Amino acid sequence: IPVIILDRQVDVQDESLFTCWVGSDFELEGKMVTEWLREYIIAKNMNPSDIHIANIQGTIGASAQIGRTKGLAKAARENGWDLLAEVTGDFTQTKGREVMISLLATYKELNVVYCENDNEAFGAIEAIEAAGRKAGSNLAAGEIMVISFDGVKKDAMQYVFEDKISCIG
């Protein structure tokens, strides 16, 4: 029976256990999103050192987490952004909310949250709003920019239209 792996890669000794893998280049996704962020910062005449990012990572070791984390880490180094924290949200809304509550309490300067999937972004937005802050693209007005990945849930696109999610990779 042919086995086709979708989305996440698997690490096995015997590659004959599956026929093929179909999925994204997750590091390239991270590169594309951070390139969008870089262009946004330039367009708004912002100083790159004024960008303070928290990465709500997916489940540690998942291929999407590894690639998306690498994409952000490399861009932060190259662009002089302040990468405040990398914490796992396990690709869930509940954990994304819990982690964001902690990040907001710890890092007052936090102005960009890079969520490695939509569920984490939804949780982060809930936490931002519960803290009396606003998720949005106007960093000069104190809003917190939310970046997400996948865009597979209807709410993700609605949040883009409402400017609660600034970019989906």
Over which residues does each language-model region extend?
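A residue-level marker of the well-folded mature domains of exported/periplasmic proteins
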Residues: 1-169
